[in-house]
Swiss-Prot record:
Description of its domains: Consists of two distinct domains, a catalytic core and a N-terminal extension that is involved in tRNA binding.
Enzyme class of the recorded protein, top EC level: ligase
Record has Nucleotide-binding as a keyword: yes
NCBIfam families for this protein: serS
Gene3D superfamilies, sorted: Bira Bifunctional Protein, Domain 2 (3.30.930.10), Serine-tRNA synthetase, tRNA binding domain (1.10.287.40)
Alphabetized CDD domains for the sequence: SerRS_core
Protein name: Serine--tRNA ligase
Keywords tagged on the record: Aminoacyl-tRNA synthetase, ATP-binding, Cytoplasm, Ligase, Nucleotide-binding, Protein biosynthesis
Function of the molecule: Catalyzes the attachment of serine to tRNA(Ser). Is also able to aminoacylate tRNA(Sec) with serine, to form the misacylated tRNA L-seryl-tRNA(Sec), which will be further converted into selenocysteinyl-tRNA(Sec).
GO CC terms, sorted: cytoplasm
Species annotation: Rubrobacter xylanophilus (strain DSM 9941 / JCM 11954 / NBRC 16129 / PRD-1)
Length: 424
């Protein structure tokens, strides 16, 4: 959420930012509502002060006629103040609703574009493998190896759910432990978060928990929703807190299941594990001072790249354009892995610097030594999204006999060098 004073003082820049992002937000209405709220607050302060003056004056006044006039004025105020308070509540609710529609400002070097087709490639690592045979995609590999069962998932739960079986279970656990070990070695605090969060935490991090546009599963008759990412719970753990500056930056590696409705997702690009309703993810999250956040963003990106280099998976890094940033991100990078099954790159990680956008919504501040509390910055980044990483790993490391050779770094975590054909 942007600061109201900033919106007032930079209304034209905020409007341009909304246009660049393709976001419909009424900046003028927000300014108008903010001004009306300020006017109502001042009016109420004056009315309450006058009410207190009248109470004292009535107690002192001995002239009955004058006393009657004072009592009548006090009675009028007694009716007027609740009406103004009700009006203020309505204005504040509308202001909060409209203010939430305004996205974060954008890094000046982020590319301007309408959608993901205008994201800008920064660099590549690795070469797409050249197979001396007709390669299979991960769905064909998973079924042939007996390790991914989409039919059982559809039967028990619905489409876009799946069972992992046998060596795929070991592979998921190995990927998770590999990522956690790497992050622990870089000073990240390990956390296993709840899979549910209060709606305030979702709204605070920029997600829409309810309504027709939501990608979130919510729990009926509660203020709880299934999380789409541990970013939500990791950010929410410090809601309404003030932390010491010397404790920053704080880095977390959060393990959780993630749940997404993936409404509207279809087509070959969404095949198999690419867009599913539930998956496991290790998420990086950091609280920093404003001065630290740029460097932290680059650190998270470098870790994401290191993970995919270590897994020997070709990838490219893209700078996300304004139309694809989402509400909270000031700047965002994606790592896209080469996926032979689609003959193209597919997103496997994202990392975003959300500056103070989430912190303002969640009331998270830090106190500089000897100073007043200030809003801190928050950042997030995917370490391992298991389902998509599994796609890239199976497809890039497949062999002609239908087996999959695991990269050397994963062997100790999975306990084998090769995932072989299913034994019947």
């Amino acid at each position: 959420m942007l600061d109201l004073r900033y919106i007032r003082e930079n209304a034209e820049a905020v409007k341009k930012n909304c246009r660049d992002r393709g976001v419909e937000a009424d900046v003028d209405l927000v300014v108008e509502l903010a001004d009306r709220r300020s006017a109502l607050i001042r009016e109420l302060e004056g009315l309450r002060a006058r009410q207190n003056q009248l109470a004292k004056a009535v107690a002192k006044e001995r002239d009955e006629r004058s006393r009657g006039r004072l009592i009548e004025e006090s009675r009028e105020l007694k009716g007027l103040i609740p009406r103004r308070e009700e009006e203020l509540r309505g204005v504040e609710e509308r202001l909060a609703e409209e203010q939430l529609k305004i996205p974060n400002m954008t890094h000046p070097e982020a590319p301007v574009g309408r959608d993901d087709s205008e994201n800008v490639e920064i660099r590549r690592w690795g070469e797409a493998p050249e197979f001396g045979f007709e390669p299979k995609d991960h769905v064909e590999l998973g079924e042939a190896l007996g390790i991914i069962d989409f039919d059982a998932g559809a039967k028990t739960t619905g489409s876009k759910f799946y069972f992992l079986r046998g060596e795929a279970v070991l592979l998921e656990l190995g990927l998770v432990r590999f990522a956690l070990d790497l992050l622990a070695g870089r000073g990240y605090e390990l956390a296993m978060t709840p899979d549910l969060a209060r709606d305030r935490m979702l709204l605070g991090t920029g997600f829409v928990p309810r309504g027709p546009e939501t990608q979130i599963y919510s729990v009926e008759n509660t203020d709880l929703s299934l999380i789409a990412t541990a970013e939500i719970t990791l950010a929410g753990q410090l809601v309404d807190e003030i932390v010491a500056e010397e404790s920053l930056p704080r880095r977390f590696a959060g393990l959780s299941h993630c749940f997404r409705t993936e409404a509207g997702a279809h087509g070959r690009a969404s095949r198999g594990l690419y867009r599913v309703h539930q998956f496991t993810k290790v998420e990086m999250f950091a609280f920093t001072t404003p001065e630290q956040s740029g460097e932290m963003h680059e650190e998270m990106l470098s870790i994401e790249e290191e993970i995919f280099r270590t897994l020997e998976i070709p990838y490219r890094v893209v700078d996300i354009c304004t139309g694809d940033l989402g509400a909270a991100a000031y700047r965002k990078y994606d790592v896209e892995a080469w996926m032979p099954g689609r003959g193209d790159y597919g997103e496997v990680t994202s990392t975003s610097n959300t500056t103070d956008y989430q912190a303002r919504r969640l009331g998270i501040r830090y106190r500089p030594e000897g100073g007043r509390p200030r809003l801190l910055h928050t950042l997030n980044g995917t370490a391992i999204a298991v389902s998509r990483t599994m796609i890239a790993l199976l497809e890039n490391h497949q062999r002609e006999d239908g087996s999959v050779a695991l990269p050397e770094a994963l062997v100790p975590y999975v306990g084998r060098e090769v995932i072989g054909p299913a034994r019947r």
